[in-house]
């Protein structure tokens, strides 16, 4: 998977939000807010270019004190949400 180029993570007033740029922004009627951990995963996905749930889960385990099974479950949930919103 890959994050679509039209979406960018921004920190606005201490909050992480995903914003649309270019033509996608015309129909973008809501901001997508991310917590700190989700923002970390977004940044990791951007760095990786092509990413998988497994690669994000490994990065989560490397950065935070979390077991792989929980990291995979959490990453599956956030990636599913990103897919639902059309971000990846």
Place the predicted regions along the sequence by residue.
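Long, charge-rich, low-complexity alpha-helical segments
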Residues: 30-88
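Acidic, low-complexity/disordered tracts enriched in E/D and polar residues
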Residues: 1-40
């Amino acid at each position: 998977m890959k994050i679509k180029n039209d979406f960018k993570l921004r920190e606005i007033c201490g909050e992480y939000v995903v914003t649309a740029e270019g033509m996608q922004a015309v129909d973008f009627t809501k901001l997508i807010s991310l917590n700190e951990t989700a923002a970390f995963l977004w940044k990791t996905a951007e760095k990786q270019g092509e990413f998988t749930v497994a690669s994000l889960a490994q990065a989560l385990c490397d950065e935070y004190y979390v077991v792989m099974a929980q990291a995979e479950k959490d990453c599956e949930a956030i990636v599913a949400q990103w897919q639902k919103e059309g971000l990846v």
